[in-house]
């Protein structure tokens, strides 16, 4: 027991982290806004020159401490223009400063922990989200039940701040952080207070998702502890993800909550065939055993969110489905388990017989309809999938137009190359290829048929498309049997770190 307590305790040098002075260091904001800083805030609103000044941040923090939050005047926005611009400045500057400070701290802790565990190489190889799908192919076909879980958002930002407070002991920093969040939410939620956390997540995504990740890691740490029990304490590679302060007090509270509803609940949690996968706010929980164990895990999540995080979640939001009769979306793919029938002819002496074999197979399919809707939203085609030209790109050079279409096509093909059925992917390539030709024909004031005949003899196009044989195969039909075999097989890449379709078709 003493060994476990020593493991769960933070190092004393890390308990005394004093980060508050970093708020007043100019290089912190230089790191945060070296590329994203909106200079119009300073030039138009404050009258400063283009050079960033730390004096603005200091004055704003002083105003935050001196401002009386109990008195709200209806004419404040008219009387004090500087205060009105302060609110934009809080959301764009100070929140990014907080994000940089805590990111630097925890990136150093993560790097040191990975170095001690000697797993840096494997950690980098497992960062790709495509590494999840080979895991699905190996494990899911042997499982029977699956549950699709949506991680609920916290109802108040204070919950996120408290979770971060367990890791960093710095009272002045968190006092300023609470003051900033209170001031921001009070200003942006005078009329609609329920949307304060939603507004903050949209205007300050970097800082919000940093806090949200800690919220997710907090409940997952207890989940992993119950899943592996004391065995996880010897896994050094995971130690940075487990909370150590007040851990056993929280565990005792969970046991007390569970005993009220289930007798010896924790003793039935042992399930060697359970698998858990999460990306962002969506989790997949699958098991081979009876659904009663899945049902216990379901109520574990609900009680944990309600009793510990004050997040309301209802049992009917988490459904347990039989895997053979259920299909689900994950990371931009449509997944379902199908049955593959095969017949094998056998012969024993003079007697011949047929053996029917049924094999479970995981089908990973490209969701063609959502992608077409996204392309239609970006004006590459209409809602029916008919290609359209991009008149807004007509002012660009031919090379730039082709490069943009190639980039989009390469991104989509790169990400969806693991599909088991490539016909949908070929349709997407056809839409982009014909949209590219229509855009070029519109620019040169020609018809699509006439421009298509010129396309084969265009030197610029030939040089560009023959630069990479893979890129050539994405836009034009290929005659190479080798490339055709590659296109029929699943290909998973280890360099994909995101799955946002909006980023896949973004030409910038």
Swiss-Prot record:
Tell me which GO cellular component terms the UniProt record holds. chloroplast
Which spans are transmembrane here?
none
Where would you find this protein in the cell?
Plastid, Chloroplast
GO biological process assignments:
mRNA processing; RNA splicing; tRNA processing
Mind listing the GO molecular function terms for this protein? Answer: RNA binding
Query: Mostly located where?
Result: plastid
Q: Which UniProt keywords apply?
A: Chloroplast, mRNA processing, Plastid, RNA-binding, tRNA processing
Pfam families in the record: Intron_maturas2, MatK_N
Q: Does the keyword Disulfide bond apply?
A: no
What does this protein's UniProt record list under function? Usually encoded in the trnK tRNA gene intron. Probably assists in splicing its own and other chloroplast group II introns.
Similarity-based family: Belongs to the intron maturase 2 family. MatK subfamily.
Instruction: List, alphabetically, the HAMAP family matched.
Output: MatK
This chain belongs to which protein, by name?
Maturase K
Q: Which organism is it from?
A: Lotus japonicus
Q: Which gene encodes it?
A: matK
């Amino acid at each position: 027991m003493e060994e476990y307590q020593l493991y769960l305790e933070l190092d004393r040098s890390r308990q005394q982290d004093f980060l508050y002075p970093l708020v007043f260091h100019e290089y912190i904001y230089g790191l945060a806004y070296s590329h994203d800083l909106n200079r119009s805030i300073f030039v138009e609103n404050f009258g400063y020159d283009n050079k960033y000044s730390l004096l603005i941040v200091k004055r704003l923090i002083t105003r935050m401490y001196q401002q009386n939050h109990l008195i709200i005047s209806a004419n404040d926005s008219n009387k004090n223009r500087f205060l009105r611009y302060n609110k934009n400045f809080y959301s764009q500057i100070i929140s990014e400063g907080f994000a940089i400070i805590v990111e630097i701290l925890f990136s150093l802790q993560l790097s040191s922990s990975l170095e001690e565990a000697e797993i840096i190489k494997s950690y980098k190889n497992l960062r790709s989200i495509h590494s999840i799908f080979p895991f699905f192919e190996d494990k899911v076909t042997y499982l029977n039940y699956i549950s699709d879980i949506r991680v609920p958002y916290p109802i108040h930002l204070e919950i996120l701040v408290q979770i971060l407070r367990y890791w960093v002991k710095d009272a002045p920093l968190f006092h300023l952080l609470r003051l900033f969040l209170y001031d921001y939410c009070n200003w942006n939620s005078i009329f609609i207070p329920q949307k304060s956390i939603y507004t903050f997540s949209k205007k300050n995504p970097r800082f919000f998702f940093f806090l949200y990740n800690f919220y997710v890691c907090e409940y997952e740490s207890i989940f992993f502890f119950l899943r592996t029990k004391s065995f996880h304490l010897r896994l050094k590679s995971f130690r940075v993800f487990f909370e150590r302060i007040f851990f056993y007090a929280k565990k005792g509270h969970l046991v007390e909550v569970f005993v009220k509803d289930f007798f010896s609940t924790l003793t039935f949690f042992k399930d060697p065939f359970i698998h858990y996968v999460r990306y962002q706010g969506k989790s997949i929980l699958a098991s081979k055993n009876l659904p009663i164990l899945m049902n216990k895990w379901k109520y574990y999540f609900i009680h944990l969110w309600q009793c510990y995080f004050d997040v309301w979640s209802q049992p009917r939001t988490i459904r347990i489905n039989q895997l053979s009769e259920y299909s689900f979306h994950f990371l931009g793919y449509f997944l379902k388990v199908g049955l593959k029938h095969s017949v094998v002819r056998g012969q024993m002496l003079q007697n011949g017989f047929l053996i029917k074999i049924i094999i479970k197979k995981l089908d990973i399919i490209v969701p063609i309809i959502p992608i077409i809707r996204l392309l239609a939203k970006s004006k590459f085609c209409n809602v029916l999938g008919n290609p359209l030209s991009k008149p807004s790109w007509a002012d660009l050079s031919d090379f730039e137009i082709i490069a943009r279409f190639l980039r989009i096509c390469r991104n989509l093909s790169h990400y969806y190359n693991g599909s088991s059925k490539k016909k949908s992917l070929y349709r997407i390539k056809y839409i982009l290829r014909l949209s590219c030709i229509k855009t070029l024909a519109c620019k040169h004031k020609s018809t699509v048929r006439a421009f298509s005949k010129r396309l084969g003899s265009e030197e610029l196009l030939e040089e560009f498309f023959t630069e990479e044989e893979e890129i050539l195969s994405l836009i034009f039909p290929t005659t190479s049997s080798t490339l055709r075999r590659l296109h029929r097989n699943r290909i998973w890449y280890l360099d994909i770190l995101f799955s946002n379709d909006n980023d896949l078709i973004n030409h910038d």
